[in-house]
Each structure stands twice: as structure tokens, then as C-alpha cells.
Amino acid sequence: WEADVYLNGIRVGGYKGGYTAFSIDISKKLRIGAENVLTVRVDSRENLNIPPFGYVIDYMTYGGIYREAYVDLKNETYLADIFLHSEIPEGQKPDAKLISEIEIKNSGKTDEKKEFLIRQSIRERGTENYRQIGESRVASDRKLSFPVPDVKLWDLENPVLYEVKTELLQNGNVLDENITLFGFRTAVFLQDGFYLNGKKVKLRGLNRHQSYPYVGYAMPESMQKRDADILKNELGVNAVRTSHYPQSRHFVERCDELGLLVFTEIPGWQHIGDEIWKKQAVENVKDMVEQYRNHPSVILWGVRINESGDDDAFYQETNRVAHELDPTRQTGGVRAHKKSSLLEDVYTYNDFSHNGTNHGCEKKSAVTSDNSKPYLISEYNGHMYPTKSYDWEEHRVWHAMRHVNVLDAVAGEADIAGSFGWCMFDYNTHKDFGSGDRICYHGVMDMFRNPKLAAAVY
């Protein structure tokens, strides 16, 4: 996918890719006091130099402008980016430090150094009054740290969110204001599993595509949030993998609100392209991390192309970029082969070993190349036993039992952090895949989100 943006017939910028947001400064090209025509030209063809394309992929990407587009009005000097993270003392004490990495931009004509005041306030979401936690005089980008007493932690059962208000002031005037939703929590994968706020949690999740019948990707905020509601409240999982690309901010925001953990990853499926392609994939890592790193639900960055082979130089770079932009989260990389080169923090593996009669999963030691590192199963079942919602009952029961068997086996393996079943619902695909009708019947629900018997397992 490629987008070219024109203002009054003049190209002012563009973007490659279809899964993360982008912005273009058009202020210097505007006709002040006159009508302006803003045009976006979208090329939705499968460009071989842009991930996930380059070879066949097992899902449809559709096309068009399927998420929001808007004009953002700003002062010449504004808050360009705010990255929030926290330090929480061990023992889950109620006091924490809020760390803010703030980027200030000046789109004006002067390079004159100016001094600004950054002021931060916080309130628990749903309450009325903000409390100021600190302020600091700055002349440029700044990393600030302010104490926040008596915080409530974000967790699965009580996902407390705070609104952090950051104000940029000069001579007592507010130039810009940003309100960011944030959750205080610790999340870490260790050798023996995943820990949230110091407590071990076995991840029990499903993979989700963002497609719908008839409309492809083009569903509004309400439907994105509804999928998160289905995962948490109807299916009963505690985690979701956004296969195989970053998904709508509305979906992830709802995961924040529900206490649903998210493993998100860059676009791709098995294929690694040339140097131009790889450069775009690295840009995809940058965009993904910068746009989703304030979400407490996000616990793992997927920095490998799903089920691709080893490419150490390439994946050293994707891993480096993710850690540089967000040192607070670990990285993973989904592979379909054992004893792979492990450059990330977590060995994530698609385990399709279960055939309905054998043990539900492989031992960690049989798969990972470093048994001292965390291990996570990123896919299972799916194409091993395609099942329609109207298949005969015995077939649907066996489909459900395959999910039971894997979940039971993973629960018995103390050193496996958890697993993500393939997948939440059936989806459209290319002609090379599916059941001859361009549909993959791999879900525990059909594509209309009606449950099959396997949905009850979760």
C-alpha cells in the first residue's frame, strides 16, 4: 500500500504501509484566507517492496482509507510526542515515579531558543479533579520524573487507568495540552513464565485478524472495541496477539480498559524481501513502538516477520530499534522452526505438533535454542483441523477437544509462559489458502463472530 497526499494539487508527502498512522505538516503550503483542497491518493495494490507483501500471504489486506483521517490544528510550538513509563518499587507499594520523555517541536520560522514550562497533573479516570505532580522549565526535549503517591496498579481484574495531563506553557500561556491514558504496572517474561505486578500469570489467548465479512478492514470504533469485549467477556481469554500487524488504536484502547494483554507485531508473513523491503520493515517497528508504547495492555513487541527464517543482521536491527524506543518492554519474534537464532528477549514459536491424539504441545527444551530465556507459544491448531460452524457435531467436538488438549498441556508446563490459539474467528484469504472458497475456517468463531463449540473451551 502507498498513500500520496496532495494539497491544492501539490504533493506534500506520502506513506508506505497500511497498519500504522502517519501525519504530514501542511502548514507552509496552505492558502491563507482561501479554500484548500486536501487529496489522498491510495494505491491498494500488493506492492512487492512493502511488507507484508513480496510473496503469497495467508490473509487479505483489502484497501482504501479504512481508519480515521483528520486535520489536527496546532500552535507553532507544540508537544510532538510523550512517552510515559513508570518505576514501581518492589513489593507493590502504592508509590511510583512517572517518567515522561517529551518531544517539543517548533514549526515556526525562527530557530531562536526559547524556555518553556512543562506542567503535569494526574487523575484516576472517572474522577473529577486533577492533582499536579510536578513542573519543570525546559528549552528543548526533556525527560522528566515526578513522584506519584498512592497509585492503583493496572491488572487483569481491575485495570485502573489514569489520565495524565501534560501542559506546555510560555509566559503563563498554555501553548499545547495533551491528555494520555496510562496504567501503572510491571510486566516481565522470565525463564519460568510471565509476571504481571510480580504475580505469575499463564497467558491464555487467541490470535485476531482485523477483518470482517463484506467490509474487510473498514469497521468503526464501536466494532473494534466489540471484538475486544468478545475476547475478554465472551471467550474469557486474558491475552490477544494482533496477527500479523498492528491493529486499530480503538481495539488496543479497549484492551487497556478491559485488562486484556496484547502481543503486537510488525506486518509480514514468512517472506523477507530485499534491502528496500527490510528498511521499510524497520520503519514499521519504529511506527508500531512509537504509536502503541503508552498502552498498559501491550506487553510484548513482535519484531520478526511471522514464520520467517533467520536473518541475524536484519533482526538485530529490528530488535535494537524496539529497545531503543521502548526500553521498558521485551521483544519476541514468531518463528515456525526449532532452535532458531534467538536475538529477542522471548522465544515465541508456532507449535502445530498436536494432531488430536498426542501430547498437546512440545517441551520448551525441545524447541528453544536457549532454555534460560522465556518461551511462549504464539499459535496452535488452526489449519491442522479446519472446522465450519455447520460441520457435523462430531467434527466440531473434535475441534473443541484439540483446543482443550493444548490448553491442558500448556497449563502443565511450568516453564511455558502461555499460548495463543489460532484463531479468534474465520477469515477471508487468498486463493492459495483456505478450503477452496478463499476462507480459512480456523476460528473458534465464524467470521460473523458466532461461536463454534471450541469457543466454550476458553
Q: Model-flagged regions — what are they?
A:
Residues 1-81, 107, 237-238, 249, ...:
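Accessory beta-strand-rich segments of carbohydrate-active enzymes
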Residues 82-83, 153, 165-233, 253:
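N-terminal carbohydrate-binding accessory modules
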Residues 70-91, 446-458:
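Short, compositionally biased P/S/T/A/G/V-rich stretches that sit at domain boundaries
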Residues 31-35, 101-188:
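Extended acidic/polar, glycine-enriched regions
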